[in-house]
From Swiss-Prot:
Chief location of this protein within or outside the cell: secreted
Lineage, opening ranks: Eukaryota, Metazoa, Chordata, Craniata, Vertebrata
Protein name: Apolipoprotein D
One GO CC annotation: cytosolic ribosome
UniProt GO MF annotations: cholesterol binding
Family the entry assigns: Belongs to the calycin superfamily. Lipocalin family.
Keywords: Disulfide bond, Glycoprotein, Lipid-binding, Pyrrolidone carboxylic acid, Secreted, Signal, Transport
Signal peptide, first to last residue: 1-20
InterPro entries: ApoD_vertbrte, ApolipopD, Calycin, Lipocalin_ApoD, Lipocalin_CS, Lipocln_cytosolic_FA-bd_dom
Cysteines engaged in disulfide bonds, as pairs: C28-C134, C61-C185
Modified residues (Pyrrolidone carboxylic acid): Q21
Amino acid sequence: MVPVLLLLPALAGLFGAAEGQAFHLGKCPHPPVQENFDVNKYLGKWYEIEKIPVSFEKGSCIQANYSLKENGNVEVINKELRADGTVNQIEGEATPENITEPAKLAVKFFWFMPSAPYWVLATDYENYALVYSCTTIIWLFHMDHVWILGRNPYLPPETVTYLKDILTSNNIEVEKMTITDQVNCPESM
């Protein structure tokens, strides 16, 4: 018990340092994912509309492009426009996490890092997608990541509300979500 008590102040400091990120007591929730998910319909370019802020995304004009690799996995290319006008890009690979639930993927960007969950909670493939990721930290806390994506840089407010309602109905907080700036983005991205 004493080691846990010593660990709590350190974790509190860590959580305070991760401004905007969503840390919560307890293990990750397990919301239902998109039924009959078809990865082939999901491929292509998506624009980030809103998200729970994450330390690894600081820019604007954030977008993701998904394509099928020869091995059957999904190539992930994420891009953002930095404040200095340069484009930051990262490439990763998504693999099925559970063959019976194809909307549950695991994405990995660096060989030395563990994979992270990438769960598609909802999509109509042509307009919107709702993506959820959660990591449990030493059985005491969990950290949420949420992305609302669109095939176009903007979604109607009623669509965003619909997607946020899915989150809140599954006890996933949306209060920290922020709108991603998609104004004056270079076409070359």
